[in-house]
Amino acid sequence: MKKWLCLLLAVVMLLSLAACGGGGSTGNGDSEDDEKYANRSKRFTLCYYEGGYGADWLRAVVTDYMDNINQDVYISLKNSTDNAVAREKITTQTGTYDMYFIEVDMFKKSAVLEELSGLLEMEVPGEAGVKVKDKIEPQWLSYYEEDGSYYQMPATNFMGWNWTYNKTLLDSKLGEGNWALPRTTEELFALGEKLFEKDVFLTAFAGKDTTGGADYLRYCYEVWFAQMTGMEGYNNYFNCLYNNNGTYELAKDYPHNIVEHRNAIEKTYAVAQTLCQGRNGMEFIHSKSESLTFLDAQFLLNQGSFRGAQEYPIAFYYNGASAQQEMTDYVKDGIIQQQDVRMMKMPVISSIIERTPSIKDDATLAAVVDYADGKGQLPEGVTQEDAAIVTEARNMMAELVCREFVVTKNAQNKEDILNFMAYLTSDRAQLIAAQHCNGLPVLNYGYVPTEEELGFAFTEFTQSVYDILDSALVVDIAKFDKPVHLAVGLSWYKDTSVSGGTLSGNLYIKNALTADEIYESTLQAYSATWKDRIEQFLVQQGQ
């Protein structure tokens, strides 16, 4: 395999010349009438959503497939700008394409999607004896299974969201070696105070997006909530289960799950409130946050300008693993200067010590975080049980598990589509895709490329992402495997005093409840209709 991969490098380098670039016909099927493939007897159209990782990786694997794997087929690529619109077209079977890469769930769409169980049994091209299902992790096979059938295949890797930070900026403002990454939320806020004194904001939120789609801080808050509940408690909460004398049961008549997790709700909300409103006269959130788009905030993290004017920078930003990819063109064009931006593990919510009786204070908690990271000894008196709680919390990472390949029921040349999908799971395709994503394993089929195989060294950012992925525990914000939470519209909190806006935005302008008020608001909001919603859900489930 290693020999074969080394030989492939030459092909990859050639492909990179053809596949890089933005939109039109580049010899990769990204137009309807690509002359290079015009005479091919078979064709199908793949409609894709160009997320943070861009589309160069997809163009590259499509080019490789058409040039080197199947020279009878032409794959035409079409860019979709809206996942919801694409899903609606698929659902109504109006103006659909043959295959989709879509970043939204496609559950309960068996009437309009091709069943893919046969694909899972196909052999992966170039890998004798290896089936497609062997390349997909069991947890994702379980996740996408619907009554014994499959209509979705996981697409891009779940590399999640976490805190990114600008080391260049931190070194220049605080002095290299004079600061440390925050291990707890108390340390995060203490660092924010130091930065504020240096004319640097700790972070920002994308307030211009009033729907909240780009305000990824909401994912951060939910991870802190999961840290307070633990993963088992988090799953129980959103599955609407509560502890009834030692047995976990569905809370049918009343939201007992909310009652059980009152402390987690209050303590998580308190951290969000402090982050957004500051403390001790210090501000942590950038003063222009209400006007920022997601891209604006990334510019501020990279010490760029805002609307043509130099602004105070931010040192941290809660972001996805595609952050480096999204800034690459701006660095190349000289719009922003190259910065040493990296990703870090989640600071542990300081209130977690209420779950860990042998950890008495934040300093001890920070030392246990070091132990969890493999950087020190377990402090004297701290139990292994409490250390395990902190380790689980430290490794949590937010993700939306909803990126799939699907085939429409009325697609043409379905056999050719399935052959292409089998190819996508190959190490060959995964290597080519990673080549066009700064070395990140963008395709979700288990292959992790080395620097030698890629032909270039990882950047500090890429290496930092890998360091997190090695032990990451996914907190799935989408929760499509928890249908009862969708039935009741369950969130970790509910502020009945506001209508619209995001938690970050409402807290920032102090148009939101306080941490002392949020539990009662949450309980009252859900208890009013809880019993009826659960009954409706059970009827829909045939129970």
Where is each model-derived feature located?
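Positively charged n-region of N-terminal signal peptides that target proteins for export
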Residues: 1-4
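Conserved N-terminal structural module of periplasmic/extracytoplasmic solute-binding proteins
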Residues: 6-7, 17-109, 124-132, 177-178, ...
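Pocket-flanking alpha-helical
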Residues: 59, 81-118, 130-153, 163, ...
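Extracytoplasmic/periplasmic substrate-recognition and gating elements
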Residues: 74-76, 148, 308, 312, ...
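Glycine-centered hinge/linker elements that transmit conformational signals in sensory
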Residues: 191-192, 233-296, 341-352, 357-382
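Conserved C-terminal helix/tail region of periplasmic/extracytoplasmic solute-binding proteins
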Residues: 430, 444-543
